[in-house]
Regions:
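N-terminal positioning helix adjacent to the helix-turn-helix/winged-helix DNA-binding module
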Residues: 37, 41-44, 91, 176
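Alpha-helical DNA-contacting segments of helix-turn-helix folds
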Residues: 40, 49, 83-91, 98-99, ...
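N-terminal intrinsically disordered/low-complexity leader segments
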Residues: 1-36, 47
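Amphipathic alpha-helical segments used for helix-helix packing
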Residues: 124-141
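Helix-turn-helix
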Residues: 40, 48-82, 86
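Hydrophobic alpha-helical connector segments
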Residues: 86, 100-127, 152, 176-180
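Amphipathic alpha-helical packing segments from all-alpha helical-bundle domains
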Residues: 16, 100, 141-166, 174-178
Length: 182
């Protein structure tokens, strides 16, 4: 059987072959990013941040490094600062996880082990740490999840220090924790 479309003859056999090729191409397109693209991009951004420093991290360089189209990351990060905020959130979550492991009845041990974990994170992830505590993100309150992650980490440090400290004065605790945080 043959169809004619504006002087273009196509046999039914050719249509079947063409359809199979299209299905194969379509399935490849759909499976190109079979996972969570945002997570893959964020993991890549963290690696790039550590390798090159956050000042070299851009949405364009992230797309290139991740082997995705230049527009793909923009679906998840509208601006460079949005990307920085997401990297910083991951950093604060990692610090919080590291320092939260220590929850014994010995407040001195908790403080020492938590401080070691905090310092270890900073040394191992120096560029991410610089991003988290630097000036690249102008206003943490613009990013509620970033503010929450940073605050959760700070409050854990504060609570651990308060348990350890013999001086329970709130102003003393706050000033001491700001020194620890910095």
């Amino acid at each position: 059987m043959t169809f004619t479309i504006k002087d273009f003859n196509v046999s039914s056999v050719n249509i079947n072959v063409l359809c199979k090729q299209c299905q194969h191409y379509y399935s490849q397109m759909n499976s190109y990013h079979h996972g969570n693209l945002k997570k893959e991009l964020l993991d890549c951004a963290l690696k790039m941040c550590e390798r090159d420093g956050y000042t070299k991290l851009s949405i364009r360089s992230l797309a290139k490094e991740s082997n995705v189209s230049q527009t793909a990351p923009y679906r998840h990060f509208k601006t460079k600062e949005d990307l920085y905020a997401e990297v910083a959130i991951e950093g604060f979550n990692k610090i919080h996880k590291a320092i939260s492991k220590y929850d014994s009845n010995d407040s001195k041990r908790n403080l020492i082990d938590g401080a070691k974990a905090y310092i270890k994170f900073g040394l191992k992830n120096a560029n991410t740490y610089d991003l988290m505590f630097g000036t690249a993100i102008k206003d943490f309150t613009k990013y509620p999840m970033l503010f929450e992650a940073a605050n959760k980490t700070y409050l854990h440090i504060r609570s651990t220090f308060k348990e350890f400290s013999k001086n329970k004065d709130d102003l003393y605790i706050e000033e001491s924790c700001i020194d620890i945080w910095a």
